[in-house]
Amino acid sequence: MWRYLPKRSLDLNRKGLMQRKLDDKYFINTFDEETKLYSKKENTLLLIVDEQPRLMKALENGEEAVLNTIALIKAFEKYDMPIIATEQYPKGLGSTDERILDLIDQKNIFEKTIFDAAIPEVLDFIEKNNIKKVVVAGAEAHICVYQTTRSLLNLGIDVFLAKDALASFKESQKEEALKTLREMGAVRTETETILFDLARDSKDPNFKFISGLVKEMRAR
C-alpha cells in the first residue's frame, strides 16, 4: 500500500512510477513517524470562534453553523482531541451558545475584545499542547475568523476552515473571506469531510459514531 511521506514533492511508488506528494497542510492529522501515516490526532485543535446566540441569530445560516460545530465537537471529543472557544465581548454579546457550553470544558473558553482570536491565551494553549493544525468554526467568517486564520497561518499553523460551520452577515461575505484565506494557504473544507477524514477507515472503532453524526446532519 502506498503511503504519503511528509515534505516531499516527488517520490517513487512500488511500480517505480513518479507520484506527486501533497503538502502536509492537506492532512488533518499530523504525521506519525512510527507508522509513517498521517494518523496522530492529538496535535489537531478545534477552535470555535465567538458562537454566541446574539451574534449567530443575526447571521445568514447562523443556526446551521452552530449545528455543524456541535457535530465537530462531538467528533473531536470522541477522539479525545483538544477543543477551545473564544467569546467576543460577552458583556455585550452574551456567552457561548448553551448547546456548545454543555459539551466543552468551560475553562477552555477565553474572552476577548479584539476581533483576532489568536489572543495570548489561545496561543499559549497551542504552544503547550504542541498544536500543529487547527480546524476553525465560528463567526464572523469575514471578520474574526478571517483575522484569526491569517494570524495562525503566519505562525506556520495549518488551518482547516469548516465552511458550513462558519457564518457571516451575508453569505457573499463568507465566500469572499474563504476565497482570500484559501489564497493565503488555508484549506477550505466542510464538516462531513472533516468527520470522515478523522475516521479514515470503516474499521475505525469510532466509525459507527461518526456515521451517526453524518446521518443526523443529512436528515436536517
Where would I find each of the regions flagged by the language model?
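A positional/architectural concept
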Residues: 54-59, 64-86, 90-102
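Active-site-adjacent betaalpha module
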Residues: 19-22, 26-43, 91-220
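Intrinsically disordered, low-complexity segments enriched in serine/threonine/proline/glycine
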Residues: 7-8, 21
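N-terminal nucleotide-binding beta1-loop-alpha1 segment
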Residues: 44-51
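Active-site loop/turn elements of alpha/beta-hydrolase fold enzymes
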Residues: 51, 88, 164
